[in-house]
Amino acid sequence: LHLSLRRQRQMCIRDRLQRVYLAMILAQDTDYLLLDEPLNNLDLKHANQLMKLLTTLVEDYQKTVVIVLHDINFAARYADHIVAMKDGQIFKAADTEAVIQEQLLESLYEIPIKLVQVDGRQFCYTFQ
């Protein structure tokens, strides 16, 4: 129990620190944002809130947002362009619909991938 409480406290601190860093970036009011794994240490609720905020910055304030993500489904949901990397090399760079394809993702991840459509977007899952 003690370790669990410590872990929760550390995750809460990291979550708040991430928000402070994002606020500092936004205060600079640049035309672009470069974010490396901004969803790390965020629960699903806060990760979605952050991605919606970034979408608002793009749509309403004409910001350019470049994000490094390892969660292909967040990329499928929010990105309009994906650069998929494999072994340190560009595997495919194209609009989201061209990248989120079963064959391409199976080659990228080297596991069976199935796609399901939700709200007009493709999402992937695997049970391996």
Task: Tell me the role of every PLM-derived stretch.
Residues 1-9, 13:
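Single conserved hydrophobic/aromatic residue that forms the stacking wall/gate
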Residues 75-77:
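A short, surface-exposed alpha-helical micro-motif characterized by mixed small hydrophobic
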Residues 69-70:
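H-loop/switch region of ABC-family ATPase nucleotide-binding domains
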Residues 102, 106-128:
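ABC ATPase nucleotide-binding domains
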Residues 48-60:
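Helical segment within the ABC ATPase nucleotide-binding domain
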Residues 33-37:
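Catalytic Walker B motif of ABC-type/P-loop ATPase nucleotide-binding domains
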